[in-house]
């Protein structure tokens, strides 16, 4: 209510970030469903299971996002499965810089793929 009634903002998107259905406020209050995922070990994944978990919490189809990830999704798996993640954000520092979590080649492959929307599009 603060942003809408006091600041008079009318172009907000409300993001719910949790895999737990118990905390879901309801479809009328949420525009985007998301979740944070930090795998304990590296594996190629499109995060399909996690996608299915969060969409099961809604009765309407919502935009779904990976709010924070350690390992970026595998672009080849995403192309094949067509999981409609709207966006992902790789967390900072060691998750973005260096080769421990996401290699430069993996990151470059994702950003250069047709699956990614780029600024010039």
Regions found by a protein language model. Give the residues of each.
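Aromatic-lined carbohydrate-recognition surfaces of secreted/lumenal glycan-active proteins
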Residues: 1-22, 61-72
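Structured segments of extracytoplasmic/periplasmic soluble domains
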Residues: 2-7, 54-57, 88-94
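Extracellular/periplasmic catalytic domains that process cell-envelope and extracellular macromolecules
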Residues: 7-9, 25-29, 58-59, 80-82
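Polar/charged alpha-helical tracts
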Residues: 10, 49-56, 76, 105, ...
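Alpha-helical scaffolding within the catalytic cores
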Residues: 16-24, 45-54, 70-79
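Aromatic- and acid-rich polysaccharide-binding/catalytic face
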Residues: 19-43, 90-93
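Substrate-binding surface in catalytic domains of secreted glycosidases
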Residues: 35-56, 61-62
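Substrate-binding cleft of secreted/luminal carbohydrate-active enzymes
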Residues: 61-121
């Amino acid at each position: 209510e603060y942003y809408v009634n006091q600041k008079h903002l009318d172009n907000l998107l409300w993001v719910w970030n949790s895999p737990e259905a118990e905390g879901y406020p309801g479809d009328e209050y949420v525009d985007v469903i998301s979740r944070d995922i930090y795998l304990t070990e590296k594996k190629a994944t499109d995060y399909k299971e996690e996608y299915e978990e969060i969409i099961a919490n809604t009765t309407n189809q919502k935009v779904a996002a990976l709010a924070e990830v350690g390992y970026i999704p595998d672009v080849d798996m995403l192309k094949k499965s067509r999981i409609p993640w709207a966006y992902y954000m790789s967390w900072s520092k060691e998750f973005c810089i260096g080769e421990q979590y996401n290699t430069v080649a993996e990151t470059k492959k994702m950003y250069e793929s047709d699956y990614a929307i780029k600024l010039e599009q």
